[in-house]
């Protein structure tokens, strides 16, 4: 009898102890997780955006807000707030410059996020040093540049004020390439001459003697260039405030069609299986087994459906992402605004401004598919014919901010 009592007593105390242990463990985990989430919310750098105004004028042109945006009345430059801090992985691992969480990084990089500092947004635009530009050769280019800088500055002053959403500094600068010798920051905009700009940066860095001898794979997969998010916070802050910051843009419709032609009309081991298969599966009724299997043959109309779909089967890509989301012009306040439409003149003028070697000129060759006709307004019209007027309007609305801030003419839809 005593043995039974002892056995039941031990069993009872053991059960009670186990329950107590489980309760304490759950309480500790919940308490600890709460602290972590609270700390996470405190990390990062705060930036700010502003309210929609009704219109903005340049010296010779007026930019009108789309009617639907006037009705919405929200923040024009709504940056959003990512749930995790993102960092770029190797371009050789994924052609579109995918992202991963910085939580996978070790050491000093994590320390950066534990000690946030306040950035003064927007950054102050630096006056261009024109002491190295001689004669009247660049007079027209200089006048054009001043108009663009002034227009973007006025646009951001009216539309780009902020109300304090949190956004991480390292995400904002993740597409900016650094050339320390000539103190240049170049924000990469795919399909706006970025491959040749990377060639120029490699020459300026002393990594190559000529921009004409660097292959496409070396440019994009060689990992020769540093992006601004690879530096610590002090290094990022110093470069943003002292280096010459440049961005080169392109008419949004031309850039979109150029990206489609490059990625979907030619063999591609990444875009066809990753994007093509998902697009065909969702937007092509009765798709063939072959198309579903290899993702080749995406039509522009199907691509447009994907672009405009709030529930895309696969995420956005830098080749057709908006410049406002790639380079954050109203936060970075770029010192030089070049355009693809005047790329040669703009780029060579910029090289003069930064004191590049006299023999270095911007390459004018087509990086890939050289036999294809360049994407221009005529080519764009051929692709837009496949879309209804409403669909064309929706694409314009998608890129409306890029049209507005860089003073591009509204297309005839």
From Swiss-Prot:
GO terms for cellular component: Golgi membrane. This is Carbohydrate sulfotransferase 9. Keywords: Carbohydrate metabolism, Glycoprotein, Golgi apparatus, Membrane, Signal-anchor, Transferase, Transmembrane, Transmembrane helix. One of its GO terms (molecular function) is dermatan 4-sulfotransferase activity. Residues 27-413 are lumenal. Belongs to the sulfotransferase 2 family. The chain crosses the membrane at residues 6-26. The keyword Transmembrane applies. Glycans are attached at residues 129, 213, 286, 294, 407. Residues 1-5 are cytoplasmic. InterPro entries: Carb_sulfotrans_8-10, Sulfotransferase. It comes from the Eukaryota. It comes from Mus musculus. Signal peptide: none annotated. It is an enzyme of class 2 (transferase). It is found in: Golgi apparatus membrane. Highly expressed in kidney and pituitary gland. GO terms for biological process: carbohydrate biosynthetic process; sulfur compound metabolic process. Its EC number is 2.8.2.-. Catalyzes the transfer of sulfate to position 4 of non-reducing N-acetylgalactosamine (GalNAc) residues in both N-glycans and O-glycans. Participates in biosynthesis of glycoprotein hormones lutropin and thyrotropin, by mediating sulfation of their carbohydrate structures. Has a higher activity toward carbonic anhydrase VI than toward lutropin. Only active against terminal GalNAcbeta1,GalNAcbeta. 3'-phosphoadenylyl sulfate binds at residues 190-196, 250-258. It is a single-pass type II membrane protein.
């Amino acid at each position: 009898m005593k043995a039974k009592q002892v056995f039941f007593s031990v069993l009872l105390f053991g059960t009670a102890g186990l329950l107590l242990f489980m309760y304490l463990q759950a309480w500790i985990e919940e308490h600890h997780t709460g602290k972590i989430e609270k700390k996470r919310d405190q990390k990062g750098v705060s930036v700010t955006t502003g309210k929609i105004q009704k219109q903005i004028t340049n010296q010779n042109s007026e930019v009108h807000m789309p009617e639907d945006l006037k009705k919405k009345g929200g923040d024009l430059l709504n940056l959003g707030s990512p749930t995790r801090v993102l960092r770029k992985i190797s371009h050789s691992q994924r052609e579109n410059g995918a992202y991963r969480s910085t939580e996978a990084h070790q050491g000093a990089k994590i320390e950066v996020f534990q000690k946030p500092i306040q950035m003064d947004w927007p950054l102050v635009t630096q006056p261009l040093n024109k002491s190295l530009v001689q004669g009247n050769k660049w007079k027209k280019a200089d006048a054009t540049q001043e108009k663009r800088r002034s227009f973007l500055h006025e646009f951001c002053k009216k539309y780009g004020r902020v109300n304090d959403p949190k956004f991480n500094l390292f995400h904002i600068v993740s597409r900016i390439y650094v050339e320390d010798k000539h103190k240049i920051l170049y924000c990469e905009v795919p399909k706006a001459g970025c491959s040749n700009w990377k060639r120029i940066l490699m020459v300026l860095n002393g990594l190559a003697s000529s921009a004409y001898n660097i292959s496409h794979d070396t440019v994009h997969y060689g990992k020769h260039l540093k992006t601004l998010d690879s530096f610590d916070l002090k290094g990022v802050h110093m470069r943003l405030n002292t280096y010459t910051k440049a961005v080169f843009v392109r008419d949004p419709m031309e850039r979109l069609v150029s990206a489609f032609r490059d990625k979907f009309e030619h063999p591609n081991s990444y875009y066809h299986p990753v994007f093509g298969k998902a697009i065909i599966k969702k937007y092509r009724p009765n798709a063939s087994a072959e198309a579903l299997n290899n993702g080749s043959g995406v039509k522009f109309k199907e691509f447009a459906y994907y672009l405009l779909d709030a529930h895309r089967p696969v995420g956005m890509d830098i080749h057709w992402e908006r410049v406002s989301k790639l380079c954050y012009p109203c936060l970075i306040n770029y010192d030089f605004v070049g355009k693809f439409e005047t790329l040669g003149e703009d780029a060579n003028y910029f090289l003069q401004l930064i004191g590049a070697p006299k023999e270095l000129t911007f390459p004018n060759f087509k990086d890939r598919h050289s036999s294809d006709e360049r994407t221009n307004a005529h080519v764009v019209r051929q692709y837009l014919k496949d879309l209804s007027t409403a669909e064309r309007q929706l694409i314009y609305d998608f890129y409306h901010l890029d049209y507005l801030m860089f003073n591009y003419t509204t297309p005839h839809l």
